[in-house]
A protein has these predicted regions:
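Sec-dependent signal peptide recognition
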Residues: 1-8
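N-terminal signal peptide c-region/cleavage motif recognized by signal peptidases
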Residues: 11-13
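Noncatalytic, solvent-exposed loop/strand surfaces
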Residues: 15-247
Length: 247
């Protein structure tokens, strides 16, 4: 069991900038907050609160006074004896458990809502620890993608499931060796998600309804990269890095 902790930094009276998705507001890992005390020797940060959490690799997102985080709830897994010459880093196993999404109050860690669902893992077992992707918060919605392809859209206010899909099952694609790890992104009314397979390496869904809008590209394996959108020569371009190509 890990602890999720929030540290208090000495910041001016204005509220700190939100961090609503993977790599922050600009998806570039840049924190643009001003007047932040960074001399931790002179003025070290102090812990404000902590709450128990399950296992996982996903970072928290922060938006509108709330913290959104994913984790995994499962009993410890004990592997059987490996065959001679087997590399433990490539041995798959079916491991029962649940994935969970929680919303906490930013000021004190109070759990405002949570949702869990069955998610048996089938990736290589030493890394079958938990979700990889940070929740994405956008215009009152929270989007999460689990390690086995469970894609959910929640109401940020009360945690109601607005829509859900299992992208690996629907697009008939085997769970990547180290789990689904590419983060979805929002562009206008679209939620763009890396998937994998023939014609569905990347899929765009209506972010409000979850309906497929388009799909593109072929890849033998999904890869673990996160799509990026940049304006190049005046045009919005989607960059997708799969297991074989940069598209």
């Amino acid at each position: 069991m890990r602890l999720l902790s929030i540290l208090l930094f000495m910041i001016a009276s204005s509220p700190a900038e939100d961090w609503p998705q993977y790599l922050g507001p600009g998806r570039d890992a840049v924190w643009r907050e001003q007047k932040v005390e960074l001399d931790f020797v002179k003025r070290p940060p102090r812990q404000v609160w902590s709450v128990p959490a399950g296992s996982g690799y996903a970072g928290p997102s922060v938006a509108d006074g709330r913290v959104f985080v994913m984790d995994r709830l499962a009993k410890p897994y004990r592997a059987g004896k490996l065959k001679p010459g087997s590399n433990v880093n490539f041995v798959r196993a079916r491991i029962p458990g649940k994935e969970r999404v929680r919303c906490l109050r930013e000021t004190n860690g109070e759990v405002l809502w949570e949702h869990s669902y069955e998610a048996d893992y089938s990736s290589v077992y030493p890394y079958a620890i938990g979700p990889r992707t940070t929740p994405l918060v956008y215009k009152g919605m929270v989007y999460t993608l689990g390690a086995e392809g469970h894609l959910h859209a929640y109401s940020a206010e009360d945690g109601k499931v607005v829509w859900q899909r299992n992208i690996l099952k629907e697009y008939e694609f085997e769970t990547p060796l180290w789990g689904t790890a590419g983060h979805p992104l929002v562009e206008g009314d679209l939620l763009i998600c890396p998937v994998g397979g023939e014609g569905s390496t990347v899929v765009a869904f209506d972010r409000r309804s979850g309906k497929e809008k388009w799909k593109a590209l072929n890849a033998r394996e999904a890869g673990y990269g996160t799509p990026v959108i940049e304006t190049v020569n005046g045009h919005r371009q989607l960059l997708v890095w799969d297991a074989e190509n940069l598209n």
